[in-house]
């Protein structure tokens, strides 16, 4: 069986996901076959594996860092929020239905066999399993029947590194308070604490670290500096929204619908030096972008109503009429059609049909069975502004409940309005270049002013940079002793 180590945090956004990804990369560089694991993940950003299973993107990032194919065994339970108190429950990559929070809380212990089967299967194939917890292990109201933090650590006998975020302040209270709220057997599982996102001179931190070690009786395993590493992170949505809204040579506006999902679809546009990618949720911020992107959503009908009530629908229609490129992905694509119907009440009770924006000649109907598949092909028959895509290869994945009358498998539309069910459609080489060239031609500017972008090479360099940061801040000799059970 594989060696294992678990990354737990003092809170959400402490940096567990990226630290786990960085550790996966370091171990890969050191010659180990390593796989990530998170028993239960809650996220709207998901991914479809080659065999058609759905999993959280955090473990996809970690798998990529480890140099292996994403596998639903790495995330056997995925919860996709549908309301403030309910989620779609996905087990081993397949939808089990929608549940209210209390119902899931009562039933989650029944998923332990699925969690252990997935974990043991991975552990039989790899040298090391890097496990990520969720939130904090000290959420005393959630400790009963826990299957994602200390409960999981006990099930798979995993040693733990506890991570605290110093960037938001109070890291010593975070770490000490978390340890203090744990049971004695749980405290013994914590082999080291890690201070994450540190800015400044570590020497200033040393007195506090020594006191923390004395108070907790646990060594400090590392201080990870705050690093500007460009890697998709499921907790990074707020940061993306808060980025500078300065407009550059080309201006792309993403409509920030309330239930946005798979926002990482648009990451390729962020890497061009003279392209701004802005998230917009009110008409006054839309201005006159060169391209409008309608993202995926967990609730197409609810977000379509919001789009209408906010005035953004009228603004998008006006922009499209003026020739602005409009592109919808998944739920955003559905919104661009004539109607969206839900006769089986798949999304929510009370609405059976709603008018779309009417920019694409198609209708969408929701059905109970979910489409989840990887897809690839070559663009053909594309007309209008994006005709330059013809002949280019694409690949990605589909996750949707709706069925639409599509003109082509990957892309529907003509003139200046297009839509697709394919998440990741902008990732393949040449696709973003072609779209940006079309925008430049319409605007009368030179594409040479935009730096071309190699998505795969860039991502690999970022994983290596993350590994450098983790290797430099974490005591890896200590980590290896933890893995070998010498601590």
Locations of regions flagged by a protein language model:
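A conserved active-site-flanking secondary-structure segment within enzyme catalytic domains
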Residues: 337-392, 396
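Flexible phosphate-sensing "switch/lid" loops adjacent to ATP/NTP-binding sites
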Residues: 2-320, 325, 342, 368-369, ...
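Catalytic nucleophile serine of serine hydrolases
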Residues: 330
């Amino acid at each position: 069986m594989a060696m294992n180590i678990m990354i737990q945090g003092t809170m959400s956004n402490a940096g567990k996901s990226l630290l786990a990804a960085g550790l996966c990369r370091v171990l890969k560089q050191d010659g180990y076959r390593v796989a990530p694991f998170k028993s239960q993940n809650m996220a709207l950003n998901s991914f479809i594996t080659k065999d058609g299973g759905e999993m959280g993107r955090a473990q996809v990032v970690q798998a990529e860092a480890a140099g292996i194919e994403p596998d639903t065994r790495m995330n056997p339970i995925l919860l996709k929020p549908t309301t403030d108190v309910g989620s779609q429950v996905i087990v081993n990559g397949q939808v089990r239905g929608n549940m209210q929070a209390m119902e899931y809380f009562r039933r989650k212990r029944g998923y332990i066999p699925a969690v252990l089967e997935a974990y043991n299967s991975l552990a039989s194939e790899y040298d090391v399993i890097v496990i990520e917890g969720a939130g904090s292990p000290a959420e005393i109201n959630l400790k009963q029947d826990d299957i994602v933090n200390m409960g999981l650590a006990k099930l798979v006998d995993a040693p733990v590194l506890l991570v605290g975020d110093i960037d938001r302040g109070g890291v010593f209270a975070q770490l000490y308070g978390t340890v203090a709220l744990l049971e004695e057997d749980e405290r013994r599982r914590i082999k080291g604490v890690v201070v994450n996102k540190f800015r400044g001179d570590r020497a200033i931190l040393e007195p506090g670290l020594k006191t923390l070690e004395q108070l907790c009786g646990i060594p400090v395993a590392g201080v990870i500096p705050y690093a500007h590493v460009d890697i998709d992170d499921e907790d990074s949505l707020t940061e993306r929204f808060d980025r500078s809204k300065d407009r550059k040579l080309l201006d792309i506006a993403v409509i920030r619908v309330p239930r946005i999902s798979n926002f990482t679809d648009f990451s390729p546009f962020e890497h061009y030096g003279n392209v701004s990618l802005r998230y917009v949720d009110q008409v006054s911020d839309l201005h006159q972008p060169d391209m409008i992107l309608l993202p995926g959503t967990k609730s197409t009908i609810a977000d379509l109503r919001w789009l209408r009530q906010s005035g953004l629908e009228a603004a998008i229609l006006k922009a499209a009429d003026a020739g602005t490129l409009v592109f919808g992905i998944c739920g955003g694509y559905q919104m661009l059609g004539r109607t969206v119907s839900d006769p089986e009440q798949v999304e929510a009770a009370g609405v059976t049909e709603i008018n779309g924006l009417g920019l694409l000649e198609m209708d969408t109907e929701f059905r109970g069975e979910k489409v989840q598949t990887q897809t690839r092909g070559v663009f053909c028959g594309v007309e209008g502004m994006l005709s330059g895509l013809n002949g280019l290869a694409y690949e990605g994945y589909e996750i949707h409940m709706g069925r639409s009358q599509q003109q082509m498998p990957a892309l529907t539309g003509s003139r200046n309005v297009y839509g697709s069910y394919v998440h990741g459609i902008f990732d393949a080489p040449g696709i973003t270049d072609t779209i940006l060239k079309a925008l430049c031609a319409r605007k009368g500017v030179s594409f040479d002013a935009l730096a071309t972008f190699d998505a795969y090479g860039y991502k690999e360099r970022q994983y290596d940079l993350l590994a450098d940061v983790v290797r430099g801040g974490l005591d890896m000799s200590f980590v290896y002793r933890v893995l070998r059970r010498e601590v």
